[in-house]
Amino acid sequence: MQKMPIELKGSNFTFLVLYLNTNNVDLISKSLYKKIQEYPQFFKNVPVIVNVSNLLNQVNWKKIQEIIIEYGFYIVGVSGCKDNYFKKIIVESGLPVLLESNTTNTNKDLRSFYHTSTLKKTKNEQRLRVKKIEKTHIINTPVRSGQKIYAKYSDLVVINNVSAGAELVADGNIHVYGSVRGRVLAGANGDITSKIFCTTLFAELISVSGQYWLSDQIPSHFIGKSAQIYLKNKFLTINSLS
């Protein structure tokens, strides 16, 4: 049967939400700059929804929009706008005003933010990924800032420390027997059964199959402790190893 030239279908995309809590353009700019300096590659061209529910009157939306774009964010829509005049300004700037129910289900506290990528995989796809996992890739030396290690179709084991600015990526599980201060991304090929294990957690970012937490989203009582990170009911979950 021949397919139609175009199709409109429902999907399950979710986005990072940028909550603006001040009208002060300079303060917004400085705060974005500081955040980007912490994770320069992570925020490059990342799509975001801008939530303006906490903004008061006299908002210079044009300038705020310019600043967000200048820092490399891609605005896909604006949520939390209740003022009709403000809505008109946003629409005239070329952006859609989104209903709250259409945005990511997040707590206003960024620490509670769950980034849920599309996780609908067929059983056959999952079996193929499991079959592709090969011999474990083992690193015995320290992983320095700026280094990136990718264990393709494999688990990754690091028996040493991982510095801030370093990145570990594996299609399977990742084990770090040491202190980890860089970025750790398991299940890079979409395997939702992958896990992260580490003995001393100070990571800048942890991710399993596309779902991630930044350092300030990791529950504080796990910082500096041994932990395992995995997906449970499609959400990132962390437990103690001790």
From Swiss-Prot:
Xref: Pfam families: MinC_C (PF03775), MinC_N (PF05209)
Gene3D superfamilies associated with the record: 2.160.20.70, 3.30.70.260
Keywords assigned: Cell cycle, Cell division, Septation
InterPro entries named in the record: CAP/MinC_C, MinC, MinC_C_sf, MinC_N, Septum_form_inhib_MinC_C
GO biological processes: cell morphogenesis; division septum assembly; regulation of cell division; regulation of cell septum assembly
Record-linked SUPFAM superfamilies: Cell-division inhibitor MinC, C-terminal domain
Family recorded in the similarity comment: Belongs to the MinC family.
Subunit and partners: Interacts with MinD and FtsZ.
HAMAP family xref list: MinC
Described function: Cell division inhibitor that blocks the formation of polar Z ring septums. Rapidly oscillates between the poles of the cell to destabilize FtsZ filaments that have formed before they mature into polar Z rings. Prevents FtsZ polymerization.
Protein name: Probable septum site-determining protein MinC
Source species of the chain: Buchnera aphidicola subsp. Schizaphis graminum (strain Sg)
GN (gene name): minC
